[in-house]
C-alpha cells in the first residue's frame, strides 16, 4: 500500500465507525519515546520515521506535526504524499489542538486509540473539540488495517533479566520502599507505574523489547502492602521470579493492569501523573480517589547512586576506547583515499564498540551525517539516502552504546578536508558553547531553564540559535533520553548532584552545514560558602575533540584551559587501556593548544 492508500483506508475505517477523523501519535501504552515495533503505527501510515509526531486524518485532508529536529527530514519523507507537513512551533503553524478546533464541526467525532495517547494530551484534544461541539472517542481503527497487511511486528516475548545490586546499588525491595515513602509524602497510597524505564528502575528489570533501549514491555502497581508486575507469561526465569518474590513482587499478565486497578478498594488513593499515563488507564485510575503529581520514580532514578556512578564512569572509559579506535580507523581510511559512505561510518563504529566488554547494542540509531546532511539534527542514512564522504567539510557522528555498566551518548564533528571560513567560525562558536556549559558553576537552586543559557551565550552573541534543548538526562542501562532533568528553555527541574546530562549545543544551517559537540556530564558538589551550596559538572565522556578547525584566538583563556585540561584527562583515563600505537595517536590528539 502507498501512503495515500493507507490514509484512504483510515478514512474508510473512520466512516464505518461513525466518525469523521482519526489521530495517531508516536506513542504507546507506556508513553515511551522509543516504541516497540508493535505500537509504532505512525511511520507505517505516514512514511515519516522521526520521533514526537502526530498525524491527523479527516475526510478531506491530512496533516503531520513534527518538531524542529525533523523539519527537513519530514519535508523529504512526506513529499509525494497528500500529507501536509506542519512544522510545530513555527510562526503561523497551528498546534494540533488548534487544527482540530478549526477542522471539526458540531456533532463530528475524532477517533484515537486511548491506550496510546497520554491523558494530558487526550484531555487537551477533548477540550479543543468541545469548543465546536465535536467529540473524541477512544477507538483503535488503525490496528486492523495494519494487521491485515501482515506487516505489523509482534509484541516481544523473549526472556527478560534482572540487574544485580552490584550493578544498580539497590534491590527491588529497596526501591519499592523509596516509592512508598514518596507516596506517603504526596498523601497517596498507590501508584500505577507505566513508563518502561520506571518499571525497569523499580524492579531492576531489563529486556530487549525496544530498539536500542534495554527495557521490558510491562506495568507495575505499587500499594502500601503489595507490588505487582504485569508482564506477558513466561518472560522471567524461575530464578528471577524467585528474586522478585523475595522483594515482595507478584506477577500477573500484561493485559490485566486495568482490571487490577478496578479491583482495588474504593478508598485507595492513586498518585496520577497525567503526562505519563495513557488515557484508557487514566479513566480507570480516576474511578478511585486521586492526587495529581509527577510519578516520583522520575525524580528518584534521575539521581544516580554511588554504585551506578562508579559503573557509569567505567562504561565511559570502555566507550572512549572504542571511539578512539574508530577515530583512528576513520583517519587512516581517509588518508588512504578510501571511499566511505555514511553507512560505512556506522558499521566501522559498531565494529569497534562490539569489541568492548559488556557492550550489547547501540543506545540509538547512529547519526552519521556528511556535509549538508548534518543540518538535519536527527538525519539517518538509509537505502539510497547515503552520502559518500568527500575530502572537504565536516562529518558529524552522533552515537552511543549500551553496556552492562551504563549507557553512553556522544557527538563529534570531524573535519574530513579543507574547511571554509564560515565552517571554522561555526565550529569554534559551538565549541565555546560546549565549554561554557561544561565549566558552569552554579547555586543548587538552578534549573535546566537557567543553565541552558550558559551554552547558548556564545552562539547568541552572533545571533545564532539551535531549535532544540542543549542537553538531556541519560538512563542507566536504560533509555538514552531520560528526565526529569534537561537543559532547555522550559525545564523547571532543579539540578542535583548525581544527575547526568548531555552537553550538546550546535549550529544547523540548512543546505550549508551542521555542527554539534556532545559530552555527557555528571552534576557534582562544589562546596558551600556564605553565598550558598555550589554545584558544577565533571565530564563523563572521554574522547578527544577535534581541534584542527578551532580558531584558537577566539577562545577565552578559561575556555582554552578547559579544553587542554579535558584532553589531559582523556589521555590519563584512556591510555592505560591502549596499545603503544594507540597511545601515541591519542597523545597527539590530546596535545595542548596554544595561542
Residue spans of the language-model regions?
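Active-site neighborhoods and metal-handling regions in enzymes and metal-associated proteins
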Residues: 1-595
Amino acid at each position: 500500500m502507498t501512503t495515500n492508500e493507507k490514509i484512504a483506508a483510515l478514512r474508510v475505517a473512520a466512516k464505518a465507525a461513525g466518525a469523521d477523523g482519526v489521530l495517531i501519535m508516536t506513542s504507546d501504552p507506556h508513553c515511551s519515546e522509543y516504541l516497540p515495533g508493535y505500537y509504532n503505527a505512525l511511520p507505517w501510515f505516514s512514511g515519516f520515521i522521526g520521533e514526537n509526531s502526530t498525524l491527523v486524518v479527516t475526510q478531506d485532508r491530512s496533516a503531520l506535526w513534527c518538531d524542529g529536529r525533523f523539519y527537513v527530514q519530514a519535508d523529504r519523507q512526506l513529499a509525494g504524499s497528500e500529507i501536509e507537513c506542519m512544522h510545530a512551533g513555527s510562526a503561523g503553524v497551528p498546534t494540533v489542538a488548534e487544527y482540530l478546533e478549526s477542522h471539526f464541526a458540531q456533532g463530528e467525532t475524532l477517533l484515537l486509540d486511548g491506550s496510546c495517547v497520554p491523558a494530558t494530551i487526550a484531555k487537551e484534544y477533548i477540550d479543543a473539540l468541545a469548543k465546536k461541539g465535536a467529540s473524541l472517542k477512544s477507538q483503535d481503527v488503525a490496528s486492523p488495517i495494519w494487521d491485515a497487511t501482515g506487516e505489523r511486528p509482534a509484541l516481544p516475548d523473549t526472556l527478560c533479566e534482572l540487574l544485580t545490586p552490584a550493578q544498580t546499588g539497590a534491590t527491588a525491595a529497596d526501591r519499592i520502599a523509596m516509592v512508598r515513602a514518596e507516596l506517603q509524602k504526596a498523601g497517596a497510597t498507590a501508584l500505577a507505574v507505566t513508563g518502561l524505564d520506571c518499571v525497569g528502575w523499580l524492579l531492576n528489570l531489563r529486556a530487549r523489547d525496544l530498539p536500542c533501549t534495554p527495557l521490558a514491555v510491562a506495568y507495575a502497581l505499587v500499594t502500601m502492602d503489595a507490588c505487582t508486575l504485569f508482564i506477558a507469561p513466561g518472560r522471567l526465569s524461575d530464578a528471577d521470579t524467585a528474586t522478585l518474590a523475595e522483594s515482595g513482587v507478584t506477577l500477573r499478565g500484561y493485559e490485566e493492569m486495568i482490571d487490577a486497578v478496578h479491583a482495588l478498594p474504593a478508598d485507595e488513593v492513586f498518585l496520577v501523573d497525567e503526562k505519563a499515563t495513557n488515557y484508557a488507564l487514566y479513566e480507570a485510575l480516576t474511578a478511585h480517589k486521586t492526587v495529581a503529581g509527577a510519578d516520583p520514580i522520575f525524580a528518584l532514578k534521575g539521581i544516580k547512586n554511588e554504585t551506578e556512578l562508579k559503573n557509569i564512569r567505567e562504561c565511559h572509559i570502555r566507550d572512549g576506547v572504542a571511539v578512539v579506535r574508530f577515530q583512528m580507523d576513520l583517519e587512516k581510511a581517509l588518508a588512504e583515499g578510501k571511499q566511505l559512505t555514511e553507512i560505512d561510518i556506522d558499521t566501522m563504529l559498531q565494529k569497534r564498540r562490539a569489541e568492548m566488554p559488556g557492550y550489547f547494542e547501540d543506545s540509538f540509531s547512529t547519526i552519521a551525517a556528511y556535509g549538508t546532511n548534518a543540518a538535519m539534527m536527527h538525519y539517518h542514512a538509509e537505502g539510497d539516502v547515503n552520502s559518500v564522504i568527500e575530502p572537504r567539510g565536516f562529518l558529524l557522528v552522533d552515537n552511543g552504546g549500551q553496556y552492562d555498566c551504563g549507557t553512553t551518548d556522544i557527538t563529534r564533528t570531524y573535519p574530513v578536508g579543507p574547511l571554509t571560513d564560515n565552517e571554522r567560525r561555526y565550529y569554534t562558536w559551538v565549541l565555546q558553547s560546549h565549554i561554557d556549559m561544561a565549566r558552569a558553576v552554579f547555586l543548587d537552586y538552578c534549573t535546566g531553564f537557567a543553565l541552558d543559557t550558559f551554552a547558548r551565550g556564545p552562539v547568541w552573541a552572533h545571533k545564532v540559535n539551535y531549535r532544540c534543548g542543549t542537553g538531556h538526562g541519560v538512563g542507566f542501562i536504560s533509555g538514552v533520553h531520560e528526565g526529569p532533568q534537561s537543559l532547555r528553555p522550559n525545564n523547571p527541574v532543579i539540578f542535583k548532584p548525581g544527575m547526568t546530562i548531555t552537553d550538546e549545543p550546535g549550529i544547523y544551517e540548512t543546505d550549508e552545514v551542521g555542527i554539534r559537540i556532545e559530552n555527557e556530564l555528571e552534576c557534582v558538589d562544589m562546596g558551600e560558602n556564605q553565598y550558598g551550596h555550589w554545584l558544577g559538572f565533571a565530564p563523563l565522556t572521554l574522547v578527544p575533540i577535534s581541534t584542527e578547525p578551532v580558531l584558537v584566538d577566539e577562545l577565552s583563556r578559561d575556555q582554552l584551559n578547559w579544553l587542554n585540561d579535558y584532553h589531559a584527562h582523556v589521555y590519563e583515563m584512556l591510555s592505560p587501556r591502549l596499545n603503544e600505537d594507540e597511545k601515541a595517536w591519542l597523545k597527539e590528539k590530546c596535545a595542548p593548544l596554544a595561542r
